[in-house]
Curated annotation (Swiss-Prot):
<protein>
    <recommendedName>
        <fullName>NADH-ubiquinone oxidoreductase chain 6</fullName>
        <ecNumber>7.1.1.2</ecNumber>
    </recommendedName>
</protein>
<keyword id="KW-0520">NAD</keyword>
<keyword id="KW-1278">Translocase</keyword>
<feature type="transmembrane region" description="Helical">
    <location>
        <begin position="24"/>
        <end position="44"/>
    </location>
</feature>
<dbReference type="GO" id="GO:0008137">
    <property type="term" value="F:NADH dehydrogenase (ubiquinone) activity"/>
</dbReference>
<dbReference type="GO" id="GO:0031966">
    <property type="term" value="C:mitochondrial membrane"/>
</dbReference>
<keyword id="KW-0830">Ubiquinone</keyword>
<feature type="transmembrane region" description="Helical">
    <location>
        <begin position="121"/>
        <end position="141"/>
    </location>
</feature>
<feature type="transmembrane region" description="Helical">
    <location>
        <begin position="77"/>
        <end position="97"/>
    </location>
</feature>
<keyword id="KW-1133">Transmembrane helix</keyword>
<comment type="function">
    <text>Core subunit of the mitochondrial membrane respiratory chain NADH dehydrogenase (Complex I) that is believed to belong to the minimal assembly required for catalysis. Complex I functions in the transfer of electrons from NADH to the respiratory chain. The immediate electron acceptor for the enzyme is believed to be ubiquinone.</text>
</comment>
<keyword id="KW-0812">Transmembrane</keyword>
<keyword id="KW-0679">Respiratory chain</keyword>
<keyword id="KW-0472">Membrane</keyword>
<feature type="transmembrane region" description="Helical">
    <location>
        <begin position="49"/>
        <end position="69"/>
    </location>
</feature>
<keyword id="KW-0249">Electron transport</keyword>
<feature type="transmembrane region" description="Helical">
    <location>
        <begin position="1"/>
        <end position="21"/>
    </location>
</feature>
Length: 156
């Protein structure tokens, strides 16, 4: 049950990535995703592996965060409206809790090796992870706005 709630929280934070208007809000959102991912790994793998994943994830995020801060002007976070975040979280929890039959692998299932990944009972879990990655990629492409060219122009 805890792994299901972690996955639902990761989905909700993925959906709220697009609502981030400033780099600070985006950084906090990605930090929450890193904490959820590390806690998920710590719950059914080793805590050392979760710690390493967290450090790698945060290190990459800090580089990107510093780059975006250098490109964007200082913006004030004003009129922060929590309603879109709450609505997306509520819809995600209610839809996935009542309509799906996702089996999250337990520690005893993991001892079977990599064959657990290809079982039919874990197919919705893999599709869900792939959709999270796809949605994150689309959000990053939308935020960088391809039509405006490169983030930093090349100057020889």
């Amino acid at each position: 049950m805890i792994l299901t709630s972690f996955m639902l929280m990761m989905i909700a934070t993925t959906f709220t990535l697009y609502l981030a208007s400033t780099p600070i809000v985006l950084g906090v959102n990605i930090l929450m995703m890193a904490l959820l991912l590390a806690s998920t790994f710590a719950s059914f793998m080793s805590s050392w592996f979760a710690f390493l994943i967290f450090l790698i994830y945060i290190g990459g995020m800090l580089v990107m965060f510093a780059y975006f801060l250098a490109l964007t002007p200082n913006q004030q976070i004003s009129n922060f409206n929590i309603m879109p975040y709450a609505l997306i979280t509520l819809l995600t929890f209610s839809a996935l809790t009542y309509t799906t039959n996702i089996k999250i692998p337990t520690f005893s299932d993991i001892s079977q090796g990599n064959s657990i990944l290809y079982m039919s009972s874990t197919a919705p879990f893999l599709i869900l992870l792939a959709l999270i990655l796809l949605l994150t990629m689309v959000i990053v492409v939308k935020l960088t706005s391809r039509s405006s060219g490169p983030l930093r122009p090349f100057s020889p």
